[in-house]
Design a protein with these regions (language model features):
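Histidine-centered, transition-metal-coordinating active-site segments
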Residues: 1-207
């Protein structure tokens, strides 16, 4: 990039970081994603326990099978065919049908996703203390069956780095013909360090 583009790149990188935390890693997005993951995990757990879980063919194939690297090598066309055929409609159709499933956890998660009664999400710059997690867990046990609580209390972390200097750094073509890394020529360098936030996701007290 020519030297005159330095500040445009800086503005782009700042906007990129803001987009990640305000859009892609927004609380609502992360909460919904984690709930969807747990819904599928519950469906998979039920199948492995011998419980019938109805789903469209492409999704059902993965619920009732445990693919390995060897499976993809030996039955490549079959596995990839099912994977390529899996889409949002399969997932939403399954979740809608699970709203009437006998299993409480699967039914509860499905109803919440369809009706947008999403879990609360807390972000923290530091890992949550064991005491705090235990406190939330105890509160959930007063509302949900104890065996179901691990599904309703989700913990994890999200990381994002707006720019990295160790791989594929942007190169600037200076007026004198030199080619220098962007981090060396920017007056207001964007911090390359990765930002990590820890989260807890669980049902709201009134929902």
């Amino acid at each position: 990039v020519e030297e005159k583009g330095i500040y445009s790149i800086e503005k782009f990188l700042v906007a990129r970081r803001l987009m990640y935390w305000q859009v892609y890693l927004h609380k609502t997005v992360v909460a919904a994603e984690q709930m969807l993951v747990r819904t599928m995990q519950r469906a998979k757990d039920l199948v492995q326990a011998g419980v019938t879980v109805p789903a469209p063919e492409n999704l059902s194939f993965f619920l009732y099978n445990n693919p390995s690297a060897d499976d993809f090598r030996q039955r490549r066309e079959e596995w990839i065919g099912y994977f390529a055929g899996l889409d949002d409609y399969d997932v939403m159709s399954a979740i809608k049908s699970w709203m009437r499933h006998d299993d409480f956890v699967l039914r509860e998660f499905s109803e919440r996703l369809i009706n947008r009664r999403l879990f609360k999400l807390e972000f923290s710059n530091e890992p949550f203390s064991d005491a705090y997690v235990a406190k939330i867990s105890q509160q959930l046990k007063s509302v949900y069956p104890e065996a179901a609580v691990p599904y309703f209390l989700l913990a994890g972390k999200e990381s994002n780095s707006a720019y990295t200097t160790f791989k594929d750094e942007i190169k600037m073509l200076m007026k004198n013909g030199q080619v220098l890394p962007w981090s060396q020529v920017s007056d207001h360098s964007v911090q390359p360090a990765s930002v990590t936030k820890y989260y807890l996701v669980y049902p709201k007290a009134d929902a």
